[in-house]
Amino acid sequence: MFLVGLTGGIASGKSSVIQVFQQLGCAVIDVDVIARHVVQPGYPAHRRIVEAFGTEVLLENGDIDRKVLGDLIFNQPDRRQLLNSITHPEIRKEMMKETFKYFLRGYRYVILDIPLLFETKKLLKYMKHTVVVYCDRDTQLARLMKRNNLNREDAEARINAQLPLKDKARMANHVLDNSGEWSLTRRQAILLHAKLERSMEYLPLRLGFLTGLAGIASLLYLLTRYLLPSP
């Protein structure tokens, strides 16, 4: 099995493309969902965040107040690094758990929905393939203005706050162009899925896993046969 990192930009259509892959039966892990999950009360990251930033980051129900925490680390590289050192290891552990579940169920590849895949670069080394859902800037701007009911200035500010889609497209292995008709984008996603399904890149890990199981089985057999007392 291998990992596919999928990303996009605001109003590029990433969520719609993810739905296509899910309809095709693909395994999809949303890293944002995991990031929210690991900071819930009762989890180690929650306790460490409170220890590091104080109870002022808590809501009345004990959840992390994401806005307050965001304000605390805004333009504070040291604090942001501290928060990342708390949350990123927990996120990676949960990702590994979810990925292993899909591995055991026989999936050839798993898609990781990672909004900041190229910005942080923390997870890039784990990805066999990277995919960007792209659209040209004019289309992105028009969609964002319509979707969020924004004026041009506000919409441009939000787009400019992100790494440009054209830059992400240059760094990706695969680009799904969502600038035109949705039917064309959907077809691109279907063709990419077929290509990834045909890939043999899943074999090394699966063969290694099976070899390991065979080794354990052989060891257990030898222990049973030669070390345990006969009845």
From Swiss-Prot:
Gene3D superfamilies on file: P-loop containing nucleotide triphosphate hydrolases
Q: Where is the signal peptide?
A: none
This protein's superkingdom?
Eukaryota
Spell out the molecular function terms from Gene Ontology: ATP binding; dephospho-CoA kinase activity
Q: Output a single Gene Ontology CC term carried by this record.
A: mitochondrion
* Protein keywords: ATP-binding, Nucleotide-binding
Q: Where does ATP bind?
A: 8-15
Q: Does the keyword Calcium apply?
A: no
- One Pfam annotation reads CoaE
Among InterPro entries, the record links this protein to:
Depp_CoAkinase, P-loop_NTPase
PROSITE patterns listed in its UniProt record: DPCK
Similarity comment: Belongs to the CoaE family.
Q: Which NCBIfam families match?
A: dephospho-CoA kinase
The identity of this protein, by name, is Dephospho-CoA kinase domain-containing protein
Which gene produces this protein?
Dcakd
